C-alpha cells in the first residue's frame, strides 16, 4: 500500500519516533512497525480489540503522515484530526473485498440507493426510535457538501450564519465556500462545562441571519444537547425565522449515561419542520475516506429548496462500506462506546491527579477532549509571540504557536483551539479515539511539557 502512494512506512516510523511509541506501548520491537492487521485477531476473549495499537503511518493519513510532513521527527503521536485509530471492523473490510472481486465499476443503479436508504432508516429506528421516511434521505459525499448546498439555498451571500462557539472548525470553511459571514455566540464556560448564553444567542438572530449551524454533540466541547435546550433553540429560531442546520455526525458517539436527542425527534412539529439534519457514520467507524453521508428534512419545502443545489456524486465502495456498517455494526459500536467512555474517564482522572493546572471540559459525547491551557500557554511564550506578530500579513494565534511548542516539548500534536472560534483561543483539542496505551504515552508526554514551564 505504501509504495503505491509514494510513502515509505519504515522511513516514516523511524523518522517520526514511531518505533519509540511501539516500545512504549509494548506492541513491537524497535525498528519494527506497529500492528498492521496481518494475523491479528479482530476479537480477543470474545470482545472486539481496541487495545492493539494499529499502524496508520505511511497510509497517507492526515492525522499522522501530514503531521510528520509538517514537523518531521519531532512528532511522536498525532492527536488532532478527528478520526479514530482503531482497526476497521472485519464486516466492513469483507464487504468491500467481496465487491472488489467483481472486476467492473459501472454506474450504481437506482435500486442500490433504495436499499441503502432503507438500511439507514432502519439504523435510525433501531438505535434512536426515530422514524425517517427513506425516500426523504438525500445521500451526499459528506456532511460538508450537504451543509454547503443548504446554506446556498437558504442564505444569501453576505448574510450571517449563527454559530455557538467554540464549535466545529469545518463550519468556517463552509462559510467561506458560500460567501457568508460568521455570527458567533460564545457559550458560557463555568465549573468545567459549557452552557448556552441565551440572551446573546437571541440578540444575534438579526434579519441578516437566516440560518444557524448547530453541532450535536458539540465538537469540540462534547456537549450533548438536552431536549429542553434544543426546544429552546428551536423556539428562538422559529420566532426569528432562522433555519436550523443540525450537524449530528457524532450522534452515535455519546458517553455512557447520556442520551442523544436528534433534532428531528423533538416533540414540536413546527420546530422540526424549521430544520434539516445532517448525519454520517464515518466518524463512528472511522471510514471518512468512504465519502458518504446523508441529510433530510420533514419539511418538503425546505427539502425542495436545498435539492436544487444538491448533487449526490457518491461512489460504489462508499455505499458498500457504509451499508455493511449499518447492517452489522451495532454490537461493535456498543463495545466501542464502553471503551471510549473508559478513555474519557482515564483522561479526566489523569489530569486531575497529574496536571491540575490544565483545565478539562467533561465531555458528554464524541471521542474528543477539550483542554484549557491558559497559564501554561502564557508561560510557554506563545501569547507573547502572537502579540509580537499580530501585524503580520498572516498573523498566528497564541494557540497556533502553542501547538508548535507542544510538539517541540512533548512530541504530541494537538489541534489549536483558535480554529474553533470565539472562546477557543487558550484551548487545545485532543483526540482520544485510540488505544489506551497510546493515550497514556501521550498524556505522560504532555505532562512533561507542562512541567517544563
Regions found by a protein language model. Give the residues of each.
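PLP-dependent aminotransferase class I/II
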Residues: 274-353, 358-363
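Active-site phosphate-binding strand-loop segment of PLP-dependent enzymes
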Residues: 187-258
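PLP-dependent enzyme catalytic core of the Aspartate aminotransferase-like
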Residues: 387-388, 395-453
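N-terminal small-domain helix-loop-helix segment of the aminotransferase-like
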Residues: 39-142, 149, 327-328, 453
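N-terminal secretory signal peptides and thylakoid transit peptides that target proteins
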Residues: 1-20
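Helix C-cap/helix->beta junction micro-motif
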Residues: 178, 239-240, 410
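Conserved glycine-rich beta-strand-loop-beta hairpin in the small C-terminal domain of fold type I
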Residues: 340-348, 360-389, 424
Amino acid at each position: 500500500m505504501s509504495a503505491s502512494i509514494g510513502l515509505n512506512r519504515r522511513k516514516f516510523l523511524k523518522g517520526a519516533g514511531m518505533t519509540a511509541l511501539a516500545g512504549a506501548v509494548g506492541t513491537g520491537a524497535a525498528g519494527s512497525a506497529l500492528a498492521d492487521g496481518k494475523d491479528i485477531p479482530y476479537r480477543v476473549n470474545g470482545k472486539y480489540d481496541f487495545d492493539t495499537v494499529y499502524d496508520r503511518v505511511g497510509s497517507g493519513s492526515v492525522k499522522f503522515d501530514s503531521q510528520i510532513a509538517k514537523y518531521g521527527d519531532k512528532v511522536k503521536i498525532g492527536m488532532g484530526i478527528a478520526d479514530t485509530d482503531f482497526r476497521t471492523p472485519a464486516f466492513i473490510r469483507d464487504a468491500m473485498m467481496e465487491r472488489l472481486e467483481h472486476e467492473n465499476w459501472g454506474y450504481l443503479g437506482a435500486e442500490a440507493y433504495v436499499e441503502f436508504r432503507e438500511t439507514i432508516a432502519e439504523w435510525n429506528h433501531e438505535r434512536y426510535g426515530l422514524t425517517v421516511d427513506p425516500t426523504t434521505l438525500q445521500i451526499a459525499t459528506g456532511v460538508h457538501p450537504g451543509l454547503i448546498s443548504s446554506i446556498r439555498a437558504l442564505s444569501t451571500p453576505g448574510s450571517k450564519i449563527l454559530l455557538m462557539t467554540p464549535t466545529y472548525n469545518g463550519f468556517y470553511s463552509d462559510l467561506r465556500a458560500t460567501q457568508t459571514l460568521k455570527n458567533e455566540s460564545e457559550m458560557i464556560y463555568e465549573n468545567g462545562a459549557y452552557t448556552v448564553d441565551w440572551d446573546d444567542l437571541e440578540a444575534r438572530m438579526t434579519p441578516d441571519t437566516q440560518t444557524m449551524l448547530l453541532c450535536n454533540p458539540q465538537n469540540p466541547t462534547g456537549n450533548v444537547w438536552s431536549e429542553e435546550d434544543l426546544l429552546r433553540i428551536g423556539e428562538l429560531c422559529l420566532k426569528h425565522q432562522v433555519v436550523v442546520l443540525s450537524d449530528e455526525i457524532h450522534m452515535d458517539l455519546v458517553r455512557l449515561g447520556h442520551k442523544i436527542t436528534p433534532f428531528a425527534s423533538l416533540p414540536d412539529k413546527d420546530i422540526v419542520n424549521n430544520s434539516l439534519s445532517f448525519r454520517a457514520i464515518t466518524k463512528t467507524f472511522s471510514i471518512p475516506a468512504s465519502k458518504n453521508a446523508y441529510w433530510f428534512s420533514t419539511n418538503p419545502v425546505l427539502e425542495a429548496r436545498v435539492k436544487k443545489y444538491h448533487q449526490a456524486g457518491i461512489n460504489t465502495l462508499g455505499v458498500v462500506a457504509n451499508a455493511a456498517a449499518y447492517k452489522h455494526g451495532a454490537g461493535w459500536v456498543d463495545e466501542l462506546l464502553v471503551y471510549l467512555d473508559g478513555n474519557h474517564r482515564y483522561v479526566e482522572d489523569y489530569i486531575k491527579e497529574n496536571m491540575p493546572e490544565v483545565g478539562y471540559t467533561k465531555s458528554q459525547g464524541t471521542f474528543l477532549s477539550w483542554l484549557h491551557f491558559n497559564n501554561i500557554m502564557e508561560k510557554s511564550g506563545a501569547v507573547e509571540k502572537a502579540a509580537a506578530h499580530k501585524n503580520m500579513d498572516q498573523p498566528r494565534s497564541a494557540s497556533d504557536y502553542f501547538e508548535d511548542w507542544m510538539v517541540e516539548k512533548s512530541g504530541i500534536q494537538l489541534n489549536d483551539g483558535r480554529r474553533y472560534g470565539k472562546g477557543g483561543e487558550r484551548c487545545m483539542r485532543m483526540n482520544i479515539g485510540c488505544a489506551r496505551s497510546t493515550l497514556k504515552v501521550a498524556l505522560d508526554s504532555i505532562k512533561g511539557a507542562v512541567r517544563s514551564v
